[in-house]
Amino acid sequence: MPITHVALSPSPIPAPTSCASPWIVIPTTIPPLNSSQFPTIPLSTILLPASGAPHPLWEAFANQPSLRAENGIKFPIQLTATTPIALTSVVVGFFSTGEEGLFDEETIEEMITKGLDDMRVVHTGDIVRVQWMSVLARVRLCEPVDQGVITEDTKVIVVKESRGKKTGEPEDGPLANGIDLNGVDDSDSDEDVLSQGDDDDENNVDLPGVSTFMDIATTLGTPSISTPLRNGPGASISGLSDAPKVVKFTAKPLSQKIPTTLLLPTPPAADDAEARVYVRVNELMGLGCFSGDWIGVASDHGLFGDRLPNGSRAWRPAKVYSLPELYAGKEKVKVLMKGCVYMSPLLHANLGSPSSVVLTKSPFMNPSNIQQGALLSPVTTAPPSSATPQIPPTAKEVTLLRISTPISTDRALQPSLLAGLKTYFETSRKMVKVGDLIPVLIDESLGRNLFSPAALLPPDAENAEEIPGAGDELLYGSHGGAGIGVNNTGKLCAAWFRVGTIAPTDEATNAFSNGMTSQQWGGVAIVDPGSTRMVQAGSERGRIPPTLNSPWEYYLNIVPPPIPNNPPPIHPALELPNNYISPVHRRLRELISAATSLRSIKLGLAPLAVLLTSTQRSIGKRLLAYRAASDVGVHIFHIDAYDIIGEGGQASDVKTEAYLRARSERAASCGIENCVLLISHIEAFTAERMAEALRDIVADMRIVIATTTDVDKVPEPVRNVFTHELEVGAPDEGERTGLLRQITQERGVRLAKEIDLSTIALKTAALVAGDLVDVVERAMTACSERMEGLAAEMEGVTVRDIQLAGGDASCLNKQDFEAAVDAARKNFADSIGAPKIPNVSWDDVGGLANVKSAVMETIQLPLERPELFAKGMKKRSGILFYGPPGTGKTLLAKAIATEFSLNFFSVKGPELLNMYIGESEANVRRVFQRARDARPCVVFFDELDSVAPKRGNQGDSGGVMDRIVSQLLAELDGMSEGKEGSGGVFVIGATNRPDLLDPALLRPGRFDKMLFLGVSDTHHKQLTILEALTRKFTLHNSLSLAKISETLPFTYTGADLYALCSDAMLKAITRQASKVDQKIKEMENPVSTAYFFDYLATPDDVAVAVTEDDFMEAKKELIGSVSQKELEHYDRVRQMFETVDEKKGDATVDKKGKGRAIEIMVDGPGTGGEGAFGDDGDEEGLY
């Protein structure tokens, strides 16, 4: 029978949490019809062979919560056809459980290879069947995907593992009945865990370990049916106490919804999913209830909590369910979840966002017995009679109050808002209580596109009067509705309502008159879509749940749930997303919280105006303001200055001021203590009257935030309006790592196991948040192209097959990120000034071992141990290379940048000069600011003597060079003080005239590390340089570089040796070209040179080998760039800077004029200590 490969996945398909695929590929056959061997199989059914060997399907499905023990071992799956991928390599780990030396490794390798051949599809984690049971082997790694078929070209690698490693035999649990219970981890029974973590519980439940496949099917989705706690309201409770138990739990809001199909008993489709709480199965007995029972939930705020007028704690009913096994995790992780109750963030917010809550079984508790200072005291109540309703009463009429936000007050979104409100209550029977917050999701882009004035207002006149802004559409603008709850893509946003009043039905009113009170259900009522009347009666000002401790944006899918790079120990739905928070974000959040707090308003504190500045665009200032306001729970109203600014004279300024005041009034209508006014591109307000308008707006609001990318263009009167200025600088390496992690998680990007985001962040120096988003998107594009190329190489394989197989090939890997970073640097280098890392290594530098050691001492220590300089300790960040020209000072600086993965800035003297007063010094400041933004970075000043000569000796009338030197000295001092933000910037200067430099540059803390780069004084050093220069040449076998170096004089610099090698290669090329020309002339049929090289040339004709004669001829024509007299002069200069005159003493006092100045200049670096100069004077040549 033909074999067909299919991919299976549990239904519903679980969300991926790593690069592993939720699908598993298996081979299948379709049995013939009307065969006695194969009975009739129902449709949509797959039969799996029952054998003692572990089937990969069991392992793949063992951790999935959708397995159901219904009519045997049957469970819902999804199936799709696929083509298996041919594996390039398979790594198998093994160890022997028998005596050592029983089998040699070659025999074991043969057995494992034979076992792999018998497997039709190999999966990562599969157990390989071998002939002897004393040898256990498991597939550890498959490439390029996690599952595929073995071919003749597949490379099998067998590795012996230590028996003590847990990844050996009991990696995922013991083998029971020939089946490996991967992921069911019953190495520690529930009894052991409960005895460790739940000693304070009186009724611990003994959950037996799983030992058979039937147990897998019966325990993964629900609590074990073998326990005394069987699920369902009708279960027996003969062994339980009649008094309801009251337990205190830590409240945890969910970041993702738990699917209803995973709960047992399965709730009705019409039940409100927001009125459910989830606990571990063993904690249900502590409550004395079963999964699916009604319980009472109340906040535990102590004396300051939300209480009723009679002093009792406000509470509400909810249904309690046990966490599915997928969410509960392994037993050792469950200890971390002890005493936690999980609930919807909306329910958590309606309870008052408490840190802890109390739960009790009885929903008919008497609130008067819930006194201050006590938890919910157990109340002995009679069993409810048949007349007592088992669900909360149905509301006859519910009045909703609209929370005034920029979204809910936007005219263009009113039709979508009403439609979303209707959809919210029609999906299920919602349970509401007076004061509850209700979110309504709408598509902002779609709502604006479908906006029609004819369908603008609801039919009732009251609502029409409450919608403000019935004026010019410009008052609202295209971005006026952008507020809290808008996701990054601008698709979904949330508008909020609050429940005002609830009118009970006639039946509920009669029940209350017969002795029941409305508080028997905590004041909660059910909204029946068919009978309850919904009324929107006005609006109110208020806040929404802060996202700092409530993941409601993820829960409502406004922001996509993050995919962690590594599977966390606790399911992501049970944890708050760990987003990166920058120091500026934290500071801005504190300012917003302080300005909008009730205490500051009561004390009459002045409002705050914050100006966010940056030197680069797309750095994330506006997004920073949105997230800071979202953390506090206030709304944000955005105004783009370029949208309202007019063109023309004074009349346009008047219109701009009017539009600004009108929009600020709309922001104030949402509540000055509940709304933040955000103005972007504040530099566009250049008119004088705008400063007065901004001052009035700030006085009417509690906090105003403005952004600009060029603070120098902001008029001084406008800038004086702001009380705080926060600079959003380019992110450093740690901040870029956090941003990359957050970007990849929010976009649901799966990363390969080899990816280290800190390494990627190191290569993205000088890139800001917007650029990092582009890098991730480019990497995603590169990943798609790579998978398309991989699929094209394999016959019949598509990209979809690779994605189903999973593994690193279907995820973003190092290759994708490298291509994305390279492309981003090439495209953004000119626009944002991102410096490039030169591709020069130490292999390009000949010798200089002592110079390399000195450089590593200066640069490597601050990079690897920054904590040594964190408290203000000065570091040595300045290096000065001096010596004859052509010794490779520039090349050495580039090699330093490459060796330490530093960015490289090369500054030339004319770049800093400007004809306007003050601009030259500003250019120096900009250079160092760009370096700080791109740190770790090297700033290289070539020909430093032309940039910073001695002050007072220049003839320019304005003293430009003197001011440049002074500014350079100030920046160098800032680099060495060890202040925050100054680390990671190293300054390197190069000059062949150090005697012309300003003496102040050579003092400690500036260029205090002076290294002399001279010519090679031995033939061995010349040989080292020649080997570095010719490492990419094709040298003739008879050529000896050592022989060539012995003929060279000691006056050749590195540049001279480079010219020698280049001329030798040129002569070799000329010689080979002459031979080819002669060969063409000797041919019978004359052909062109191009035709010869295209069709007739042999490898020997195009091969160019440099011979000794080529070097000798090049040497005859080479003239050294530095004479012997010049070298002697540089030696004297070196001695002047690196030696101490023993005879120097009182005679120095008698020196005057130039002699005295030279002595002062020499004394400067001389006092820097012996470590400031070369150690033994044995300098090597360089290139």
Curated annotation (Swiss-Prot):
Residues 878-1070 are annotated as: AAA-cassette D2. Disulfide bonds: none annotated. Pfam families: AAA (PF00004), PEX6_4th (PF23315). The keyword Cell membrane does not apply. GO terms for cellular component: cytosol; peroxisomal membrane. GO terms for molecular function: ATP binding; ATP hydrolysis activity. It is a peripheral membrane protein. GO terms for biological process: protein import into peroxisome matrix. The keyword Ribosomal protein does not apply. Residues 183-204, 1173-1183 have a biased composition (Acidic residues). It is found in: Cytoplasm, Cytosol; Peroxisome membrane. Residues 161-205, 1160-1183 are annotated as: Disordered. Component of the PEX1-PEX6 AAA ATPase complex, a protein dislocase complex that mediates the ATP-dependent extraction of the PEX5 receptor from peroxisomal membranes, an essential step for PEX5 recycling. Specifically recognizes PEX5 monoubiquitinated at 'Cys-6', and pulls it out of the peroxisome lumen through the PEX2-PEX10-PEX12 retrotranslocation channel. Extraction by the PEX1-PEX6 AAA ATPase complex is accompanied by unfolding of the TPR repeats and release of bound cargo from PEX5. Regulates autophagy and biogenesis of peroxisomes and Woronin bodies. This is Peroxisomal ATPase PEX6. It comes from Arthrobotrys oligospora (strain ATCC 24927 / CBS 115.81 / DSM 1491). The lineage of its organism: Eukaryota, Fungi, Dikarya, Ascomycota, Pezizomycotina.
